[in-house]
Amino acid sequence: MSFEKFFNTAVSSWMSQEGPDSDIVLSSRIRLARNIVDFQFPTVFNNEEAQQIVSLFEQTFAHRFYPSVGRFELLKMSELQPIEKRVLVEKHLISPHLAEDSPFGACLLSENEEISIMINEEDHIRIQCLFPGLQLTEALKVANELDDWIEEHVNYAFDEKLGYLTSCPTNVGTGMRASVMMHLPALVLTQQINRIIPAINQLGLVVRGTYGEGSEALGNIFQISNQITLGKSEEDIVEDLKSVVQQLIAQERMARETLVKTLNIQLEDRVFRSYGILANSRVIESKEAAQCLSDVRLGIDLGYIKNISRNILNELMILTQPGFLQQYAGGVLRPEERDVRRAALIRERLKMEERKAMEGDE
């Protein structure tokens, strides 16, 4: 497979499209946890019940068309290769738990990959909407519309006092998790992030790494989400999160301005050194690649680097993960082989940008 063909089929819309404040906010996600009456929760149900739930969603929703997102395809975890499941995790379309610990798990995936509905994860279903930039309100609107569409066909486990019933008590109520992924290199470089994260936690929000709980903030990418689901409306939860995110955006922009004023030539040097590493390396580990990509993205946003899309960070942070590298290679790779393949893929992607720039100048 040629790189361009691989790239065009691998990239989801949230990676390649721009959204509001997408210089700092990479994506917005809304996730709704729901369970169906007359079935035990996934934490205690048996294999027969698990299969019945998958069959119910396969018969009712697979290949159905939904406006703006296209048709849904059902992917059964038992029918996917380990690399295929890993790619879905790396694209943020399913959770590691569904990929690794749910033999009767499945996922309904929309054509544009903005919508994924996980089946038999921690709850019977988890509806996820993933949009580029800061679009929490828009993602919530689509998630609620999908939620209503599904509820026309199934009965949810719901309590008048508590709200939606979920396997984990922390999700009871709205059953909603709202989150954003943010690129905050200037707050990291100025070390302001060390005081900001505890302050955010005190507001009932959680700050995690790129792939959620327990993951590292590779490439200065942080995931910020709500913790409280009970006693607040979905709209209030989203507005509270948006308010904090908008403050973070302002602080990151101020920190960038400070860096440009005080360390302009050193910052420019850092950006171009990182670009040189990405453009010329023959071997590169994931952590170094993530840091260099973060530097280059910052350089693009500050105008140091021209004619390269800022979405290159979104794309390459995903495409250089182990699952994608092995899918591109067409087989399992040892860690040292992945480092070679990662360097080659990054060089190819940068060459694509150079060709686009040259064609644009003609």
Swiss-Prot record:
GO terms of biological process kind: phosphocreatine biosynthetic process
Coiled-coil residue windows: none
GO molecular function: ATP binding; creatine kinase activity; protein kinase activity
Alphabetical list of InterPro entries matching this protein: Arg_Kinase, ATP-guanido_PTrfase, ATP-guanido_PTrfase_AS, ATP-guanido_PTrfase_cat, Gln_synth/guanido_kin_cat_dom
Motif RDXXRA motif of the pArg binding pocket involved in allosteric regulation: chain residues: 338-343
Keyword tags: Allosteric enzyme, ATP-binding, Kinase, Nucleotide-binding, Transferase
A Pfam family of this chain: ATP-gua_Ptrans
Main EC class the enzyme belongs to: transferase
PROSITE patterns: PHOSPHAGEN_KINASE, PHOSPHAGEN_KINASE_C
EC number per UniProt: 2.7.14.1
Gene Ontology CC annotation, any one: extracellular space
Regulation: Appears to be allosterically activated by the binding of pArg-containing polypeptides to the pArg-binding pocket localized in the C-terminal domain of McsB.
Annotated Phosphagen kinase C-terminal domain residues: 24-255
Binding site for ATP: 27-31, 92, 126, 177-181, 208-213
Catalysis: reaction(s): L-arginyl-[protein] + ATP = N(omega)-phospho-L-arginyl-[protein] + ADP + H(+)
Superkingdom assignment: Bacteria
Family: Belongs to the ATP:guanido phosphotransferase family.
General function of this protein: Catalyzes the specific phosphorylation of arginine residues in a large number of proteins. Is part of the bacterial stress response system. Protein arginine phosphorylation has a physiologically important role and is involved in the regulation of many critical cellular processes, such as protein homeostasis, motility, competence, and stringent and stress responses, by regulating gene expression and protein activity.
Protein name: Protein-arginine kinase
Organism: Geobacillus sp. (strain WCH70)
Chain's gene name: mcsB
